[in-house]
């Protein structure tokens, strides 16, 4: 019994009755005082099993044994209570994250000062946050102090804490806290009983565990992870509400970081699909696909993208078709929240199920999940992995195919409506793919019809035998025609609304297919009453819809075959107006023939098609009625066995229904790589047009050729040896002029002497001419003829004149200069030649002006740095000097460079003509273009070798993180090259690849594949590094092909020698590329270098 002090709020330990029945172990632990490790847990276990009163008694006994005395020991302090309840009632639970407060008083009763200190045992607890204010101090004699205790529960846990207060000269006093928290998503890791490893996620291992008796799956985050993926997946689970097709989120732990999810006993779907011991029925496979679509539709409604759809992330709840849920989605490690398309920094996820825009452009959207869903449908329906046709070609070829964006081949076993869904999911344009809402609506209708058909197969015998009524051709009972036809009409009206939703799946998919037939424009779903068509949904009344290929749906065809073999008695099926071949014959036969019995229908949303009657009593009657109908209107007779051809014998009955057709299939052919140039639209057109008549085949061939030509015109570029002869447009390029001044001066001299047709210059007196030197004496007789002979008749020059013509022009000019020099040495006098404006051809006479003045003698030994020396012959003629004018810088430069030219040319002052200006400008542009080409080629070579060294640096990788970063760097560079080529050259990557491989005789740019040293990694990590390395090398080879192609377009042909470019010898006979091409490639090189 506990006694209180006179104040009413103090416990007096001295007045507590001693109980000798206390646990000796607990007494020993309390007496020992300072304990650690397992002893603390044992103390908590024993201590908290007792009530508050028993705990106080145990502490008093332990203290009394520490301080033995005959009299009752007089303690120096008194406490108001020894248990913190935080104002909660017994059994009441506290909230997580809320601050709880309590108070305790300490009274000093000793003869002096009392020192106290609070501490928690253990001091650091990850589940609660406990503070004492103040946590220690000194209490004077006769005084008391109030301690404020605050606690915050951080997770869902059971708080069992011991609080110790050390009192000087009085030992240690223990206080208890025993509180249970309410449920929350934050869990206590100590409450998890971790079991065996059951799998691995994107960033950690998955364990099977127990949490408060519940089987859970715990995904423990690796210590090497930065935690960003953990935070992302945690946010995804917090945002999601409960959905039957999403794995239930139990909670998470903060330390260590882990996610606690619902444990699914069945495991992943991947181990069932590729295990021959498991065989799934068509109903179960379709139900699995429908469950996945429901889960994805729920995610997209909540603006969440999964981005990692694959069979490994589909958990099997049950393999029974009658179970409410078969599949649940899991693993949101790559999921993200977004309401629109966006570009991410990295690409992760599964290689085979990743959409092309995610794999190549890192573009994430809802359509990316739709593409992955289509790839998963192939594996669920046929047990074949996507891109399985490339297994024999190896991993490298598969990586190249994925890089080019080719979709996987749809197996021929998938037929009808589901094939169209998969084709729509694989649409090249991601905006034309269906959404999961339309897919869910379509699969819901198909699943309901399929299960209704299966249930009607099982119950048709008992239902028909209990109601032997007759039916007419319209499907109504002879006894009550009005009551039996109304459910059919009601069902047709209800299901017509579903057709409008289902047709939305293919509206976008077929919008661009101009060659599609009208019967394939939408997803055609026929009436469930027409068993021969194999349809799953009734069509609209009065609308004729031709039957689908292969009986519309391969799922229904398998059920139909099973029905035929199990119930061999043929029976007439009810006809819908849309399925009748001739209305007139149908009406006549219905009025003349009696009605056989019919199958009662259930009141369901989808009508149950009639099946064969197994009753042996009605077989003879049915055979007689069948003979009558066949004789009366053979065109209207429709047997339930019409799904098989008349000449084809029935196949044996199969015990287990297969989801695929049993027709023999040829070995899948690997699609050609030229398929990249054609879109999915052309592929769908070819598939749809194969069912047309022979008249349409010619149109298909013509359309295919048009598509191929159009695609090649848009994406291909052929390397032509013949270049255009048009003039290169002028473009300002800053280069040095010293390399081409001499050819310009030579051409100017030639053109000045041969341009009499366009210049009308009158001969003037010598006083009108300004010169910085005296005019020379004109030569005698034959000088004009010699000069005229040195004039070269040139055509109107263009910028595109070839180098060979230029070299011939230069050689002729040199010969003429040599002749002029020889003539000048023989002539005794000097002359000035002024062209006459009246002459129109080379035979016209030139006006010769001779100066009669005597020139001043010039010494042959004198020289000038500004003007060349003039040779003076023996015949000295007197002349007077003309007014001196300043020489231009261009003339001075020409005088320095053309020392070998004739003196008469140096002093010729005739004005430049239009042809001379064009020649100067064209030659200058040509030289600048050649220099731009050489600089661009040098830049591309530097980029080529530097990028080659980057790929070779894989041999120096020591961590998986560095390998991923290097691979991403290589991918980004390849993408930059591709985008630049598309922007400037309008070229597809297939054209660049083919052209570079044509000239690159080595085949590959890398002779040996760089490999990191295996000692730096463990076995599993090294395999991942090798896979990343192989994919990066393939992408790097493609980027090197692009750089090599750009260099091939800049073949140097302005020099008369052979120039090696990356081990390829280029002939000098190649012509200079067009100016536009050089400028575009220069822009690409500048962009890549920056």
UniProtKB/Swiss-Prot annotation:
Source species, domain of life: Eukaryota
Chain spans, region Disordered: 462-705, 747-881
Compositionally biased region (Low complexity): 462-530, 560-593, 613-646, 685-704, 748-760, 780-825, 833-868
CDD domains according to UniProt: STKc_MAP3K-like (cd13999)
Active site as annotated: 308 (proton acceptor)
Catalytic activity: L-seryl-[protein] + ATP = O-phospho-L-seryl-[protein] + ADP + H(+); L-threonyl-[protein] + ATP = O-phospho-L-threonyl-[protein] + ADP + H(+)
Gene Ontology molecular functions: ATP binding; protein serine kinase activity; protein serine/threonine kinase activity
SUPFAM superfamilies on file: Protein kinase-like (PK-like)
Family matches, as InterPro entries: Kinase-like_dom_sf, Prot_kinase_dom, Protein_kinase_ATP_BS, Ser-Thr/Tyr_kinase_cat_dom, Ser/Thr_kinase_AS, TKL_Ser/Thr_kinase
Protein kinase domain segment(s): 192-443
UniProt key word Protein biosynthesis: no
EC number, UniProt record: 2.7.11.1
Family: Belongs to the protein kinase superfamily. TKL Ser/Thr protein kinase family.
Name used for this protein in its record: Probable serine/threonine-protein kinase DDB_G0278665
Biological source species: Dictyostelium discoideum
Organism lineage: Eukaryota, Amoebozoa, Evosea, Eumycetozoa, Dictyostelia
């Amino acid at each position: 019994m506990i006694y209180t002090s006179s104040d009413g709020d103090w416990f007096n330990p001295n007045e507590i009755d001693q109980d000798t029945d206390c646990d000796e172990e607990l007494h020993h632990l309390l007496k020992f005082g300072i304990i650690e490790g397992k002893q603390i847990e044992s103390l908590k276990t024993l201590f908290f099993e007792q009530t508050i009163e028993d705990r106080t008694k145990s502490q008093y006994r332990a203290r009394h044994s520490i301080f033995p005395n005959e009299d009752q020991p007089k303690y120096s302090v008194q406490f108001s209570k020894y248990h913190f309840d935080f104002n909660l009632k017994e059994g009441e639970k506290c909230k997580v994250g809320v601050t709880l407060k309590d108070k305790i008083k300490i009274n000093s009763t000793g003869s002096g000062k009392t020192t106290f200190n609070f501490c928690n045992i253990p001091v650091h607890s990850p589940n609660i946050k406990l503070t004492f204010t103040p946590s220690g101090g000194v209490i004077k004699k006769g005084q008391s102090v109030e301690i404020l205790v605050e606690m915050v529960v951080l997770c869902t846990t059971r708080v069992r804490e011991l609080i110790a207060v050390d009192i000087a000269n009085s030992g240690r006093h223990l206080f208890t806290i025993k509180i249970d928290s309410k449920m929350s998503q934050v869990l206590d890791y100590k409450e998890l009983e971790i079991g065996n490893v059951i799998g691995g996620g994107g960033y950690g291992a998955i364990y099977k565990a127990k949490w408060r008796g519940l089987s859970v799956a715990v995904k423990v985050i690796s210590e090497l992870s930065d935690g960003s993926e953990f935070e992302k997946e945690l946010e995804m689970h917090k945002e999601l509400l409960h959905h039957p097709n999403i794995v239930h989120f139990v909670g998470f732990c903060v330390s260590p970081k882990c996610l606690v999810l619902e444990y699914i006993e069945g495991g992943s779907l991947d181990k069932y699909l590729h295990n021959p011991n498991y065989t799934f029925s068509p109903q179960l496979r379709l139900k699995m696909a429908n469950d996945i679509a429901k889960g994805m539709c729920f995610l997209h409604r909540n603006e969440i993208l999964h981005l990692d759809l694959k069979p490994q992330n589909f958990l099997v709840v049950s393999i029974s078709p009658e179970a409410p849920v078969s599949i649940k989605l899991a693993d949101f490690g790559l999921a993200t929240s977004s309401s629109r398309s966006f570009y991410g920094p990295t690409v992760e996820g599964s290689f085979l199920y990743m959409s092309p825009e995610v794999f190549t452009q890192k573009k994430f959207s809802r359509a990316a999940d739709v593409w992955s869903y289509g790839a998963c449908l192939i594996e669920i329906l046929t047990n074949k992995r996507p891109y399985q046709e490339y297994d024999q070609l190896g991993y490298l070829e598969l990586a190249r195919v994925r890089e080019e964006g080719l979709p996987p081949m749809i197996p021929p076993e998938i037929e009808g409506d589901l094939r169209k869904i998969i084709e729509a999911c694989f649409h090249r344009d991601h905006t034309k793919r269906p959404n999961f809402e339309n897919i869910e609506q379509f699969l819901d209708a198909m699943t309901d019809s399929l299960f209704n058909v299966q249930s009607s197969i099982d119950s048709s015998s008992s239902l028909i035998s209990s109601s032997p009524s007759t039916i007419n051709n319209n499907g109504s009972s002879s006894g009550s025609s009005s009551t039996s036809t109304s459910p059919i009409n009601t069902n047709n009206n209800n299901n017509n609304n579903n057709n409008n939703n289902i047709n939305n799946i293919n509206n976008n998919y077929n919008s661009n297919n101009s060659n599609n037939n009208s019967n394939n424009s939408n997803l055609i779903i026929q009436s469930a009453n027409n068993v021969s068509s194999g349809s799953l949904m009734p069509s609209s009344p009065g609308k004729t819809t031709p039957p689908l290929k292969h009986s519309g749906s391969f799922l229904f065809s398998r059920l139909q075959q099973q029905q035929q073999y199990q119930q061999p008695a043929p029976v007439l099926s009810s006809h819908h107006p849309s399925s009748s071949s001739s209305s007139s014959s149908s009406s006549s036969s219905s009025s003349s023939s009696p009605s056989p019995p019919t199958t009662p229908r259930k009141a369901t949303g989808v009508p149950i098609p009639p099946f064969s009657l197994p009753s042996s009593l009605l077989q003879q009657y049915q055979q007689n009625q069948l003979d009558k109908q066949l004789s009366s209107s053979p065109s209207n007779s429709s047997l339930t066995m019409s799904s098989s051809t008349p000449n084809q014998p029935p196949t044996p009955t199969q015990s287990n229904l297969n989801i695929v057709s049993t027709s023999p299939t040829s070995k899948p052919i690997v699609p050609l790589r030229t398929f990249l140039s054609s879109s999915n639209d052309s592929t769908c057109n070819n598939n749809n047009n194969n069912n047309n008549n022979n008249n349409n085949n010619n149109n298909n061939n013509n359309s295919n050729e048009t598509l191929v030509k159009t695609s090649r015109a848009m994406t291909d570029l052929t390397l032509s040896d013949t270049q255009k002869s048009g003039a290169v447009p002028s473009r300002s390029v800053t280069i040095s002029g010293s390399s081409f001044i001499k050819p310009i001066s030579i051409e100017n001299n030639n053109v000045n002497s041969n341009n009499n047709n366009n210049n009308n210059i009158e001969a003037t007196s010598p006083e009108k001419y300004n010169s910085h030197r005296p005019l020379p004496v004109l030569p005698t007789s034959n000088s004009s003829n010699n000069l005229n002979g040195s004039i070269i008749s040139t055509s109107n020059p263009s910028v595109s004149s070839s180098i060979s013509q230029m070299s011939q022009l230069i050689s002729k000019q040199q010969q003429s200069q040599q002749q002029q020099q020889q003539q000048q040495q023989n002539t005794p006098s000097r002359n000035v030649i002024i062209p006459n404006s009246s002459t129109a051809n080379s035979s016209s006479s030139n006006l010769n002006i001779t100066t009669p003045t005597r020139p001043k003698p010039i010494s042959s030994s004198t020289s000038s740095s500004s003007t060349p020396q003039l040779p003076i012959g023996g015949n000295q003629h007197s002349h007077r000097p003309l007014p001196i004018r300043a020489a231009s810088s261009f003339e001075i430069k020409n005088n320095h460079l053309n020392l070998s030219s004739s003196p008469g040319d140096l002093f010729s002052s005739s004005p430049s003509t239009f042809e001379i200006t064009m020649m100067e400008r064209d030659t200058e542009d040509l030289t600048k273009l050649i220099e731009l080409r050489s600089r661009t080629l040098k830049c591309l070579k530097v980029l080529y070798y530097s990028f080659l060294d980057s790929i070779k640096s894989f041999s120096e990788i020591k961590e998986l993180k560095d390998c991923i970063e290097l691979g991403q760097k290589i991918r980004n560079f390849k993408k930059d090259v591709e985008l630049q080529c598309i922007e400037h050259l309008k070229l597809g990557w297939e054209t660049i690849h083919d052209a570079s491989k044509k000239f690159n005789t080595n085949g590959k740019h890398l002779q040996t594949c760089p490999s990191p040293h295996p000692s730096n990694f463990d076995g599993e990590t090294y395999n991942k590094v090798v896979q990343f390395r192989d994919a990066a090398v393939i992408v790097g080879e493609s980027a090197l092909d692009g750089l090599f192609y750009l260099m091939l377009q800049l073949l140097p042909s302005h020099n008369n020698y052979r120039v090696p470019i990356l081990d390829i010898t280029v002939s000098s006979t190649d012509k200079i590329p067009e100016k536009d091409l050089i400028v575009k490639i220069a822009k690409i090189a500048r962009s890549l270098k920056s």
